[in-house]
Regions:
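Hydrophobic h-region of N-terminal signal peptides that target proteins for export
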Residues: 5-16
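N-terminal hydrophobic targeting signals that begin at the initiator methionine
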Residues: 1-2
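Sequence signature of WD/YWTD-type beta-propeller architectures
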Residues: 16-336
Length: 336
């Protein structure tokens, strides 16, 4: 009997303490539902609209935050299979995704590429002739972008290696193109698989994710002048994926699994919620912003911050779905 009691005591801290129900039914007053579908939100430069994806391998959409009207940006593209839409500082768009859907693995990796879409109504996406991995960092101040490459997009890389490329988008000619491409950081193996996230400090620095083995990840940053790299999360053995940065570059949103310390459940990219991390290098100033993972199967993900620091847009998601899949865009109002 004593052995059984000891076993139960040891087991109890790791038991899943999440509650049943839907987090959308118990939202705090500063969070509202914008849409009942969609994923991967992005604020317009004037913070008046939010672009988002209808679904993975789908169309890019745009919601007006004043009228709440929604229009499709890519419905003139037959069988559109885009994964991401992001605003440029000009109000135009960067699209990410394959030119057609083949299968989830190939279309998300080997065939994933960058596109330019003009803000003029009726415009069609234009290929930038650049394959890339996952998402991209798009400057809010200039036409600078950064993106990662893996072996699927760059055969010269060793198996497991990845690199981050920085480039400028040239819109001066008749066809948009990427110029001034240069490698800013490279990982030689799978101990750190790279993904670019956000420029900050007047485009002099870049946040990126270091995806690590066993479902772990770290929040990283690089000074683009000195090339000094900093691990900002400093939390080995846990999942910390940097997302939208706050204006001023002092804080960033992070998809993190830290709540698993008291809620239990498997750590990693499934059981995540949105946290706010101070980029001071200590890894200690971590504040939880959402509590969706308090519910069985629930999580909040893919947060972005408005440039006036008043709002965060994010999505409702499920722990069992692949990263990026969402079921609606929500708006979080920061209170003073």
């Amino acid at each position: 009997m004593k052995s059984l009691i000891t076993f139960l005591i040891l087991l109890f801290p790791f038991a899943d303490k999440r509650k049943p129900g839907n987090p959308l039914d118990s939202l705090p007053k500063n969070i509202e539902i914008l849409t009942r579908f969609g994923e991967r939100a992005d604020f317009s430069p004037d913070n008046q609209r939010i672009a988002f994806m209808s679904k993975s391998f789908g169309d890019a959409m745009l919601i007006d935050l004043k009228t709440r009207s929604i229009r499709c940006l890519t419905c003139n593209v037959p069988a559109a299979a885009f994964l991401r839409v992001m605003h440029l500082s000009t109000g135009d768009y960067i699209l990410i995704g394959p030119d057609h859907f083949e299968d989830i693995g190939i279309s998300r990796s080997r065939d994933n590429e960058l596109w330019f879409l003009s803000k003029e109504r009726g415009s069609k996406p234009v290929k930038l002739e650049q394959k890339m991995s996952e998402g991209a960092a798009v400057s809010k101040k200039s036409l600078k972008i950064a993106f990662a490459l893996g072996r699927s997009q760059a055969p010269d890389l060793a198996v497991g290696a990845s690199r981050i490329i920085m480039a400028d988008l040239d819109l001066a000619g008749s066809t948009p193109k990427l110029v001034n491409k240069k490698t800013v950081y490279e990982s030689m193996d799978q101990s750190c698989t790279l993904e670019a996230q956000d420029f900050y400090d007047n485009d002099s620095k870049l946040t990126f994710v270091c995806y690590e083995p066993k479902g772990q990840a770290s929040v990283m940053g690089i000074d683009l002048q000195t090339h000094q790299v900093t691990n900002y999360s400093k939390a080995p053995g846990s999942y910390n994926e940097t997302e939208g940065i706050f204006p001023g570059g002092v804080y960033t949103c992070v998809e993190a699994d830290r709540q698993c310390e008291w809620l239990g459940g498997d750590r990693g990219p499934g059981n995540i919620d949105i946290w706010k991390l101070k980029l001071d290098g200590s890894g200690k100033d971590f504040v939880r912003l959402t509590n969706f993972n308090d519910y069985e199967g629930g999580k909040a993900s893919n947060p972005v911050i408005s440039t006036d620091n008043k709002f965060m847009a994010f999505q409702f998601a499920r722990t069992t779905d692949p990263a990026g899949v969402g079921y609606g865009i929500l708006l979080y109002r920061f209170t003073k």
